[in-house]
Amino acid sequence: MSKIIGSDRVKRGMAEMQKGGVIMDVVNAEQARIAEEAGAVAVMALERVPSDIRAAGGVARMANPKIVEEVMNAVSIPVMAKARIGHITEARVLEAMGVDYIDESEVLTPADEEYHLRKDQFTVPFVCGCRNLGEAARRIGEGAAMLRTKGEPGTGNIVEAVRHMRQVNSEVSRLTVMNDDEIMTFAKDIGAPYEILKQIKDNGRLPVVNFAAGGVATPQDAALMMELGADGVFVGSGIFKSEDPEKFAKAIVQATTHYQDYELIGRLASELGTAMKGLDINQLSLEERMQERGW
């Protein structure tokens, strides 16, 4: 049974079902219900949204299981939860609880600075962040069923998510015109498994979905990421740190679905209050940048 449920094909198929949708961070049952009613395809249950994690400092860990369970009981859509990079036990606890996906997340303080989780050893599918094709291929090689840009979480600034999406897409384009010898050299240069790169070259795309995450704060941000080739959008602090979370949630879902309907997006934006306050990425030191976590 577990071999069937835990196969790459099934895990990736589950992630494909979220394609074109919005996944929202929530910290309680009420927020989860708002997200579901707004049209979210899944929710991410956590103790604090990324902007609060950033503001609080210290060590950020897996959410209290009570919070995750509360969210799971409140909605019918899939529920994700975050585990620290390399923290086998946090991931096993979440798997035992029955979450639908685990995010091995740089938003939390890494538990292991050398190794990511061997995601292929779990039954539950994983989502992981990436900034470039090397990171994407390494995570896929470890068993990730879904990818997302790292962006810079909790900033309300889309610039890093844009950079990461463009970087992955441009490297995939370069890869598709390489011969086998060039792929071998490229694999060495970017620290990626040759077999994964060969698979990407043969298919002309990543073998898993790649969502946008890290800095999405407005309907325009969500639509931009879809324009750039994202398979869907994660929204962390952007919704529940806005002036009107319910309206923002619905607007971001609609903008993601109709990302080339600019008149609609304009109308949606005009009816909203103030978005979350953003941070200038250049004012963050390397140590403050969550995207630098992992390898």
Curated annotation (Swiss-Prot):
UniProt keyword Membrane, yes or no: no
Residues holding D-ribose 5-phosphate: D25, G154, G215, G236, S237
Matching InterPro entries: Aldolase_TIM, PdxS/SNZ, PdxS/SNZ_N, RibuloseP-bd_barrel
Record: active site: K82 (schiff-base intermediate with d-ribose 5-phosphate)
GO aspect biological process, one term: pyridoxal phosphate biosynthetic process
Pfam families: SOR_SNZ (PF01680)
Positions annotated to bind D-glyceraldehyde 3-phosphate: R166
Single annotated GO MF: pyridoxal 5'-phosphate synthase (glutamine hydrolysing) activity
Domain of life: Bacteria
Its EC number(s): 4.3.3.6
Pathway where it operates: Cofactor biosynthesis; pyridoxal 5'-phosphate biosynthesis
PROSITE patterns: PDXS_SNZ_1 (PS01235), PDXS_SNZ_2 (PS51129)
Stated family: Belongs to the PdxS/SNZ family.
Assembly with partners or alone: In the presence of PdxT, forms a dodecamer of heterodimers.
Name of the protein this chain belongs to: Pyridoxal 5'-phosphate synthase subunit PdxS
